[in-house]
């Protein structure tokens, strides 16, 4: 399954646009457990805890849009867009939304 952020796939022609596919992935970040590591990461300029949660959420959302595209008998998903949200008051949660268009290729 080809998944791309571009509207086209080089060297391939889109035969039909099947459906919009989307997925959400929510991951919790254990802020208390990672407090000291988080402080070190923060002062170093990066939070490995947050980066790890974002990466896992993005991978999960990508896998879900692939599965939804397979259910449409698609060959690829084009125009994939990721949005990231960290809901206020939710105690260290990361939400990744993935959206794209399932297509059949010639």
Curated annotation (Swiss-Prot):
A Pfam family hit: YbjQ_1
SUPFAM superfamilies, alphabetized: YbjQ-like
InterPro entries in the record: UPF0145_dom_sf (IPR035439), UPF0145_YbjQ-like (IPR002765)
Record-annotated disulphide pairs: none
Family: Belongs to the UPF0145 family.
Alphabetized PANTHER family for the sequence: UPF0145 PROTEIN YBJQ
Name the record gives this protein: UPF0145 protein PFL_3418
The species this protein was found in: Pseudomonas fluorescens (strain ATCC BAA-477 / NRRL B-23932 / Pf-5)
């Amino acid at each position: 399954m080809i998944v791309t952020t571009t509207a086209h796939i080089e060297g391939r022609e889109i035969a039909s646009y099947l459906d919009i596919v989307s997925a959400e992935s929510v991951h919790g970040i254990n802020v208390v457990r990672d407090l000291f590591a988080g402080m070190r990461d923060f002062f170093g300029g990066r939070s490995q805890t947050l980066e790890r949660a974002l990466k896992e959420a993005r991978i999960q959302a990508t896998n879900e849009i692939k599965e939804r595209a397979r259910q449409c008998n698609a060959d690829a998903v084009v125009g994939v867009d990721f949005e990231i949200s960290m809901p206020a008051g939710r105690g260290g949660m990361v939400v990744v939304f993935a959206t794209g268009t399932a297509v059949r290729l010639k």
